[in-house]
C-alpha cells in the first residue's frame, strides 16, 4: 500500500512509496535495509509550526526517514527506492557531493523504532533482539555496508597482501557488544572491542585472517543485495585468501 505526500521542498510535487515496508521484516532485502538504516539512516521527529499570534499549531510535518550517501553510491539508494517503491527524485547536493533520500512517514518511523532505530540513535543504538535467525546475517551485512570497513594497504610494489587487509566495525558500544555476541554464536569468533575516546562508541576488529574469512563469507556469500564497492573488496579478499592458502600448501 502506498502513501502520497506533498513534498514541501519541491513545489507541491506528489510522490509515493510503500510506508508499510518495515512493518514486518520477513525477507533478505528488508533485513538488509534495516541494518543499513541502523548504520547510515536517520529518523527525524515530527515538527510543528506554532502561530506567534494565537499560540496554536498551524502546520504539522510528519516524522521522516533520511539516508544520505556519497554521490558515488547513488545506485545503492536507487536499489532502496526500487524495493520501497519510491517515486521521488533523490536530492543531489553537488557542493557536498552527496545523495539523499527523505521519506516523510510517521508509520515508517514507528516501525523502525521497534528495532531500536530512533532519533539521535548514534550513541544509544542496541542490537535488536526481534530479527528472525535466518535473516540476522542480512541485517549484519546491511550494518557493515553502512558502518563497516574493509581496508587495504599496498606494499612498495603496489601489491595488496592478505595480512594487510583489515576488517572492522564502528558503532554505539551497546550495539557492538550485542553484535559480537551474535558472531560468537553464529560463526564462533570472539573479537576484541576497542572503545573510542567517547566510551559510548566502540570498534570491533577481526584479529586473524581466518576469522576475517569466516565473517565475510557469513555476510556476503550467496547474498543478493549489498553495497557494490564493499562486495568488490570481499571478492578481492577471497582472491588473496586463495593465494594465501596455496602458499601454505607449498
Outline where the language-model segments fall:
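Internal intein/HINT superfamily modules and their associated LAGLIDADG
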Residues: 1-250
